[in-house]
Amino acid sequence: TGVPYLREAYHGELQRERWGLVPVAQLDSYKGLYFATFDPEAPSLRAYLGEMAWYLDTFFDRREGGVEIIGGIHKWIIPCNWKFPAENFAGDGYHVHWSHLSAVETGSGGDFRVKPDNAGRALALGRGHSIMTVGPDMVADPPSPEVLAYEAQILPEMRRRLGPRLDLGTPIAGTVFPNFSMLRPTSRTIRVWHPRGPEETEVWAWVFADKAAPPEVKRALRLSGARVFGPGGTFEQDDMDNWQGCTQTGRGVVARRHALNYEMGLGRERFAAEFGAVASDYRYSESNHRSFYRHWAELMAEGAGEGANSGLQGSIHA
């Protein structure tokens, strides 16, 4: 542990070996992503990820060499509860038509989100992990000529590496429970949502690209990430306004008296072996939201007695 003025201010008496960082109980990596836990009883990382591992591969291991970070890190603070952005990346494709319509109309984010797509699915992979997909025929990439040409070029390699499941749909966004998210369209971004209390979240965001991608593709992804999903990005501003508004509304006395409706697609999801997940019956569904909050409620209710998380089937209390 480095200590400025150790001799002058502490008179050399501070026992640095006792006051270092608290060590984590487990630390492991998957495809270049590092995960840690303070729980010595937690399952191994690979067991914790389960089927989610393959979906991470579609973002981070689709080409030989994996991915790399392009540029630096963006950090900013949003006055919202951390679960709002986590659930947004987990399964909320429904809001795009109105929240981001102005950005879509400028052409900065692509128009695939507002096109009919009966093949897309919301996939709940257990332990609160979630993925959104679009149909395999949908273009789900930043509207950049360099990126679109590159994606068409590498598709055969991706199919060889990832297998036939890739032909069922294209993963576009997701959340590894609790607070790690990734996004493919409009940019390539990964996020960590750091709670700073119940009403504030610190965002750490990076843009990534395949290591094997040519420089012009990496540049296009970096610019798209800044324009669309940077702290001042067109899509990001819309989302932050929504999350902040939801958090502020949830503070109210009246809001706390009423349940929030999370019934979209309720009872129509099913386990789909081909996806290795509980899949919605349509592209838009709140099945992933329910899975996310169900797992969160179970963790919060541990030791609180039976029935502590009852009533969560189709509604969530503020």
Task: Tell where the protein language model's regions lie, with residue ranges.
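Short, solvent-exposed loop/turn and secondary-structure capping segments
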Residues: 1-3, 47-48
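Short Fe-S-cluster ligation motifs
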Residues: 2-34
